From Swiss-Prot:
<dbReference type="Pfam" id="PF01725">
    <property type="entry name" value="Ham1p_like"/>
</dbReference>
<feature type="binding site">
    <location>
        <begin position="179"/>
        <end position="180"/>
    </location>
    <ligand>
        <name>substrate</name>
    </ligand>
</feature>
<dbReference type="GO" id="GO:0035870">
    <property type="term" value="F:dITP diphosphatase activity"/>
</dbReference>
<keyword id="KW-0378">Hydrolase</keyword>
<comment type="subunit">
    <text>Homodimer.</text>
</comment>
<keyword id="KW-0460">Magnesium</keyword>
<feature type="binding site">
    <location>
        <position position="70"/>
    </location>
    <ligand>
        <name>Mg(2+)</name>
    </ligand>
</feature>
<dbReference type="InterPro" id="IPR002637">
    <property type="entry name" value="RdgB/HAM1"/>
</dbReference>
<dbReference type="GO" id="GO:0036222">
    <property type="term" value="F:XTP diphosphatase activity"/>
</dbReference>
<dbReference type="GO" id="GO:0017111">
    <property type="term" value="F:ribonucleoside triphosphate phosphatase activity"/>
</dbReference>
<dbReference type="GO" id="GO:0009117">
    <property type="term" value="P:nucleotide metabolic process"/>
</dbReference>
<protein>
    <recommendedName>
        <fullName>dITP/XTP pyrophosphatase</fullName>
        <ecNumber>3.6.1.66</ecNumber>
    </recommendedName>
</protein>
<feature type="binding site">
    <location>
        <position position="174"/>
    </location>
    <ligand>
        <name>substrate</name>
    </ligand>
</feature>
<comment type="function">
    <text>Pyrophosphatase that catalyzes the hydrolysis of nucleoside triphosphates to their monophosphate derivatives, with a high preference for the non-canonical purine nucleotides XTP (xanthosine triphosphate), dITP (deoxyinosine triphosphate) and ITP. Seems to function as a house-cleaning enzyme that removes non-canonical purine nucleotides from the nucleotide pool, thus preventing their incorporation into DNA/RNA and avoiding chromosomal lesions.</text>
</comment>
<dbReference type="GO" id="GO:0000166">
    <property type="term" value="F:nucleotide binding"/>
</dbReference>
<dbReference type="GO" id="GO:0046872">
    <property type="term" value="F:metal ion binding"/>
</dbReference>
<feature type="binding site">
    <location>
        <begin position="151"/>
        <end position="154"/>
    </location>
    <ligand>
        <name>substrate</name>
    </ligand>
</feature>
């Protein structure tokens, strides 16, 4: 019997990406599947903290084993920014990927060091215990957007060892090499080991 796990996200892109990575290893439930329509605040100062806020909220309120992630783009020459604020980097209400990318590109104008990394932290609450998993992929920010697939900063991030952005590589390749894939694969290995 497959283990049921709630993935605490309302982000359809993330849900699709993680579902593709997990395959048939677990029965993945979304927040909609459990009738959770609460916007869980991400008020922590770290990716790990935000992931924990979401997973623990579901475990406390629904009694279901759950995992949640938070991802940040960390740019070396910007002191790790946008980091935990990646989804709302440009300010304003909601998540505006286009505005976030434009702000990032503007802040990097004239900078030679464009090294960056995507980092995903996953908090799993399983039978009252918390487990943390992390995935990191290094790369660089290019000067203009390229590609049509993916979401967020994918059109401006070129992972190390590649000459195309995540948005140009497409979901199949991205789902094998991304920061989220690395973290989710660690989660899968852990689930297989218990």
């Amino acid at each position: 019997m497959k283990r049921k796990l709630v993935f605490a996200t309302n982000n359809a892109h993330k849900l699709e990406e993680v579902s593709a990575i997990l395959g048939d290893k677990v029965e993945l439930l979304s927040l909609n599947d459990i009738n959770c329509h609460t916007d869980i605040p991400e008020t922590a100062e770290t990716l790990e903290g935000n992931a924990y806020l979401k997973s623990s909220f579901i475990y406390r309120n629904y009694g279901l084993n759950c995992f949640a992630d938070d991802t940040g783009l960390e740019v070396e020459s910007l002191g790790g920014a946008p980091g935990v604020y990646s989804a709302r980097y440009a300010g304003g209400e909601g998540h505006n990927a286009e505005a976030n990318m434009l702000k990032l590109l503007h802040e990097l104008e004239g900078k030679d060091n464009r090294r960056a990394q995507f980092r995903t932290a996953i908090s799993l609450i399983l039978d009252e215990k918390e487990y943390l998993f992390e995935g990191i992929i290094k790369g660089e920010i290019i000067k203009e957007k390229r590609g049509d697939s993916g979401f967020g900063y994918d059109p401006v991030f070129v992972p190390e060892g590649y000459d195309r952005t995540f948005a140009e590589l497409g979901n199949e390749i991205k789902n094998q090499i991304s920061h989220r894939a690395l973290a989710v694969n660690k989660l899968c290995e852990f689930l297989r080991s218990i």
